[in-house]
Amino acid sequence: MSDQPLTSVLEFTFRAATPDDASFIARYVLAAFHIIELDKPFSEEQQQSITALEPVVQQEGVLYSYRHAEIVEIKREPVAMLLSYKGENFREFRARTFQQLPFFTEEELASMDDETQAGELYIDSLAVHPQHRGCGIAQCLLERAVHRAKSLDIAATLLVDPENPKARALYERCGFTAEGRVNAFGVNFHRLVHR
């Protein structure tokens, strides 16, 4: 992995998200959580989840804010997204986020471990449209996030589902190593760190 992030590889480019990307970000966050599949029609319940998340994405001071997202485009069409943020405001942002979403009760949230903490750049969500997987987009997004963390002099962290060995292999190829477990959203995730 190089010290400098790639700004354009082959035919894909990177850009910061805007509030106008709310629908795209909502879909890709939900895809990262395996709630929807990007190449399949959405059920009514899945569409309701997207619709509920969109206004949250348009805000600042929440976990899934457009301000935390970087989008990859191919021929001006968005095809991938990585959402990351510094960990110091995690609890405040989580509370503000889930007060607006019908996904979890306060008791469920209180029983979850913190996904991140101060001194970290937490990679919350990463999703690539299935048509564009396997061509290096996810790796480039991860490299850019690691570069950002290094520029801030903090570690990059993420969680991976133990039932997703392909994702874990990608993260390990990018230099992430396992450091414990985190219980969140009903899953005992592996916590991976890049220092």
Predicted features and spans:
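Conserved acyl-donor/pantetheine-binding loop and adjacent beta-alpha core of acyl/acetyltransferases
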Residues: K86-S125
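Conserved N-terminal entry element of GNAT/NAT acetyltransferase domains
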Residues: M1-D20, K40, R195
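Conserved GNAT acetyl-CoA-binding A-motif
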Residues: G119-L121, R133, A149-D161
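Conserved GNAT-fold acetyl-CoA-binding loop/helix
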Residues: H34-V57, R67-H68, P102-F104
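A short helix-loop-beta-strand connector motif used in the catalytic cores of GNAT acetyltransferases and
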Residues: V57-I71, E88-E92, Y122
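Conserved acyl-CoA
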Residues: S111-T116, H129, C140-A155
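Conserved beta-strand in the GNAT
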Residues: I71, E77-K86, Y122, A127
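Conserved acetyl-CoA-binding loop-helix of GNAT-fold acetyltransferases
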Residues: G134-H147, A169-R173
